[in-house]
Amino acid sequence: MSLLREEDSPSSLRTLCGLFGYSRQSFYTHKDGNDFAENAIEPLIVEKARDYRRDNPGLGCAKLYIIIKNLFESTGCMPGRDAFIELLRVNGLMVQIKRRRHYKTTDSSHHYHKYENLVKEVVPMRPNEIWVSDITYVETGEGVCYLSLITDAYSHKIVGWAVGPTLETRYPLEALRMALGTIDDETASRLIHHSDRGCQYCSASYVAELKKHGVMISMTQSGDPLENAIAERANGIIKTEWLYKMKIPTIGKCKEEMERIILFYNTERPHMSIGNKTPEVAHGEQGEQKRCWRNPWDKPTEAVASG
């Protein structure tokens, strides 16, 4: 069992309690016979979960469990997932679901050239092989603004983003330039940029930026969101886990919040489609990524590729 249980180690208690802002006296306040460790650590787990829920109000219970487990597992007193979720429930820390109105962000009725889909049924095996792009809306006290994201299809890392008050091409272009700033020309020449057929991505300035760096261009062939599923999923996570739960007063504040949210998304939030790793970790790897979920049509014993 844990060092806390076996030896009541002062150094271990001091480290653990100090890490979460508690004194050893506070720890011992929660003693209950032989189960003092579990009972004492429970409020620490709840408090840490409360901290994460405050900053990340839509983070799913399973994701939050993985994060908290990584912090407390070494104590030997971390509850199982079901017990952890029950802790969240009794402490009012479950996700609150809100529905929002939707805004159109894609206009495919334009005169620009539309490119073919180069990534259909392609499973990336390295970072910077395929980037996927999309635009979504953000409601603020000043009105709606728009978030442009570029996500790596292999690692699911958001590599470029921008917030703007309109759907002008300049904001997706800003996100693209941020992303291109993270790679060299050789890497860019082996990269495919995939998007919908919206006028921003088909515009002369956006296409010119891609061609300047030798990036191959791929686009969806219809309005089916499955043709750009990873980009749609990244947008959905950002909206449902954060933006729908927040009241953002200004567009300027939105930019500040997005910087914080994307940092957490990339470096702390585990993703089931990459083996419950963070995108930052997966971005340093190559080869098949094991996903931690099955499609309804997958056989129970079938090894699943990344999704």
Residue map of PLM features:
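A short acidic/small-residue loop/turn micro-motif
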Residues: 152-153, 163-170
